Amino acid sequence: MRLYLCEKPSQGKDIAAVLGAKTRGDGCLRGPGVVVTWGIGHLLETAPPGAYGDHLKNWSLDTLPILPAQWKVIVKPKTASQFKVVKQLLKEATELVIATDADREGEMIARELIEYCGYRGPIQRLWLSALNEASIRQAFSSVKQGAETYPLYLSALARSRADWLIGMNFSRLFTLLGRQAGYTGVLSVGRVQTPTLRLVVDRDREIANFIPKPFWNLDVQLCTAGHSFLAKWVADESVTDDEGRCLDQSAATAALNALQNSQMATAISVETERARDSAPLPFDLSTLQEVCSAKFGLGVQETLDVAQALYETHKATTYPRTDCGYLPESMLDEVPMVLDAINRTDPTIGKALLLIDPEQRS
């Protein structure tokens, strides 16, 4: 039996539909010779310090640092029933296809189950960038060998264990030091959250301590040989700050008066630069969140929820959490349909759409 292991139920249903696996089972879908099952995100998690000994259940400086010699994982209680399904199917499977999200976290979700359940059969990897039918069929035609993506699992595993080591050890350390100083709460420390908090605090302090200083710019529209251009007055260094801005109003006023009286100016420096702007790539998640926050006031999680729904439910976008900004070639055949939809939505850009080469590849 060939088992397809997906990351979430919605993903499993999309893949099962293409495979013809229509018979609903307990936590899976079955078809001729195939079974599609899924996790609900991670079904396993790294064990807490107490799992390595009763002496680590209580917080004490004497037990730090906690450095597991042999790492342990445990089944997440909330999804234990689905774990049992996956474990049993892995026992029955003669071959396995990992069909989780195409990133290192998706790789880890599958690989940690494979190791925990002791599956030793052949492994292939279905690399999906989108969940529309054409992309799924394209992925089926170019299935990878499991060894090709195994390093992604090692990367995710290193990240996970680094998070654990930093979070568990430093949270205990600073909480215990805080208690010695009279603080009774928990001081949470994290590999990502603590540096991010530092950036926010530093920026907040900069804003609080900022002393506004007025400065004066002088931009002049000049004309020579029938051509006009915008020139910028450069003040003497004695009256400018580190960014070259003039801090002396009288110097700026004097320069303005001199220009108005003479009607002549000399360009002392001319810079010419030839530049080529490439078309922007599709959004990655962080850029999408920045734009949605600035334009629509959406929070980070709200933007992620919308992006996930567009990917999983509506099949309108590609996988939102990928680091790659390029679309899969399997979607090239859909370009004319997408351009037509854009034209019908906003006919004012119809002429611009005619200039697009629908066959172009990056």
Go through each PLM region and give its residues:
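Glycine-rich loop/turn
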Residues: M1, D163-V186
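Conserved phosphate/pyrophosphate-binding and hydrolysis machinery centered on Walker-type P-loop NTPases
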Residues: L5, K76-T79, A99-R104, A130, ...
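Helical mechanochemical/support elements of P-loop NTPase systems and associated helical scaffolds
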Residues: Q11, I15, K78-L89, E105-L113, ...
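A generic secondary-structure signal for well-formed alpha-helical elements
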Residues: L19, T23, C117-G121, K144, ...
